[in-house]
């Protein structure tokens, strides 16, 4: 049975097996009672969600964050996605994504869990020798990040519910007022004054009836990637091989030929490489001989669909096996390489784009437009994978200015009151979202959404009616760089 047959049979059929001795789990009666009451409900504990929760709590709100896995951090911890992409301006001179993101980086650095981006440059091992757009990335240890995020939520007084799945929104008279959840104890209801959708997929907004676009709107989504970590490598030999050959890096018809493409060609000829890639990108980690591999491409994945996501997980592990065999056979310094771990969830670049009161447009990103109510500035390039229906093709466009801004109104969901967005599901054109989908901008969005929610409660208004100047002033006072 191959991996695709396994998905068609074993995984799906298992759900139909009878289970003796289990009592039926009943939904709570719709009697208006809630097991939890909170000011701000954050749905999703990834990079955006955890920053939203901490920011809201630090600004005086009672906060509950709901996370379906057993840890906070989302793609950064579960998915092993790293490093944090650049947080600097285009010139590489100034750190512009600051606030909570900078605090997290500094606290990780202080405990040996990260390298500060000021000392990390493109075209070197910490950036997979990619020069364009990869200055000042932040290598970090996901295990240290897990613990740090737990600590920061506890310090802020955030209530965290792990192993708890969002089931459906509770919307009354056009207002988000809570959610139905499911966890080990069965169904629970939570009542909230403001909800922040930080699910990445826009699950709350979509189920609440907010208009959404899936992928590019024509059925195409960026490919997924299974990240994995490797150790027991002779880093000196690996680095020497790359340095001796990096002058051959090139791009042809949108396909990148970067790290170890000279060996990938040999592996293809030998029938030992069936992956939709022509290179292998390795990022040096915080540990001396620990490396992170961001290389697989799994096309056609709709992460809003469980069957499609299941396929991606299985295919991602297959691709990891192919790459590990390749490393041990072909790459200098890797003959005794050890696979430390694969992500506990596959890395997802794109699903739904939720409609908001404003839309981030790709032309504004490229041309450095800074709206008056910008809640963060960024210089991340427009990075779209999987163009021309080919998972190997990528489009990477740097911006024409030193930075651009993202309007607060891109985080205010359209048509449902008291609902904010944070993370890659923000309101934006698909290509524009391709710039801010990476983790530093998502964390800045989270801080902005959480701060906005707390301010709304303080002054007695809704997110839609909140004065942008008040939010911008508060964010700047709390460490955000806004020009």
Where do the protein language model's features map onto the residues?
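Flavin (FAD/FMN)-binding glycine-rich loop and adjacent Rossmann-like elements that form
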Residues: 100, 119, 132, 139-140, ...
């Amino acid at each position: 049975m191959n991996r695709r047959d396994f998905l068609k049979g074993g995984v799906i059929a298992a759900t139909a097996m009878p289970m003796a001795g289990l009592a039926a789990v009943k939904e709570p009666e719709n009697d208006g009672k809630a097991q939890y009451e909170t000011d701000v409900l954050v749905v999703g504990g990834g990079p955006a969600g955890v920053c939203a929760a901490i920011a809201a709590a630090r600004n005086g709100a009672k906060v509950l964050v709901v996370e379906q896995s057993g840890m906070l951090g989302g793609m950064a911890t579960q998915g092993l996605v790293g490093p944090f992409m650049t947080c600097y301006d285009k010139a590489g001179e100034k750190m512009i994504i600051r606030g909570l993101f900078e605090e997290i980086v500094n606290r990780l650095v202080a405990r040996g869990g990260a390298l500060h981006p000021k000392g990390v440059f493109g075209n070197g091992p910490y950036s997979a020798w990619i020069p364009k757009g990869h200055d000042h990335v932040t290598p970090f240890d996901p295990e240290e990040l897990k613990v740090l995020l737990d600590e920061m939520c506890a310090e802020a007084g955030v209530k965290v519910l792990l192993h708890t799945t969002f089931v459906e929104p509770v919307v009354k008279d056009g207002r988000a007022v809570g959610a139905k959840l499911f966890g080990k104890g069965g169904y629970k209801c939570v009542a909230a004054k403001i909800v922040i959708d930080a699910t990445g997929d826009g699950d709350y907004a979509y189920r609440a009836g907010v208009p959404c676009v899936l992928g590019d709107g024509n059925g195409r989504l960026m490919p997924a990637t299974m990240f994995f970590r490797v150790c027991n490598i002779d880093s000196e030999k690996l680095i020497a091989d790359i340095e001796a050959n990096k002058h051959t890096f090139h791009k042809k018809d949108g396909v990148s030929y970067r790290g170890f493409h000279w060996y990938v060609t040999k592996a293809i000829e030998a029938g030992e490489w069936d992956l939709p890639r022509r290179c292998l990108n390795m990022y040096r980690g915080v540990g001396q001989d620990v490396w992170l591999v961001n290389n697989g491409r799994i096309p056609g994945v709709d992460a809003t669909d469980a069957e499609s996501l299941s396929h991606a997980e299985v295919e991602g592990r297959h691709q990891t096996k192919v790459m590990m065999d390749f490393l041990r056979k072909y790459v200098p310094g890797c003959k005794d390489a050890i696979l430390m771990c694969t992500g506990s969830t596959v890395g997802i670049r794109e699903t739904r784009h939720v409609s908001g009161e404003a839309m981030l447009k790709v032309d504004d990103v490229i041309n450095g437009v800074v709206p008056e109510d910008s809640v963060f500035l960024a210089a991340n390039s427009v990075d779209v994978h999987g163009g021309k229906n080919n998972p190997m093709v990528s489009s990477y466009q740097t911006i024409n200015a030193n930075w651009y801004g993202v309007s607060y109104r891109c985080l205010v969901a359209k048509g449902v009151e008291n609902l904010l967005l944070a993370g890659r599901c923000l309101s934006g054109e698909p290509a524009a979202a391709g710039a801010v989908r990476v983790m530093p901008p998502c964390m800045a969005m989270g801080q902005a959404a959480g701060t906005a929610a707390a301010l709304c409660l303080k002054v007695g208004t809704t997110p839609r009616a909140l004065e942008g100047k008040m939010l911008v002033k508060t964010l700047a006072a709390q460490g955000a760089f806004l020009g």
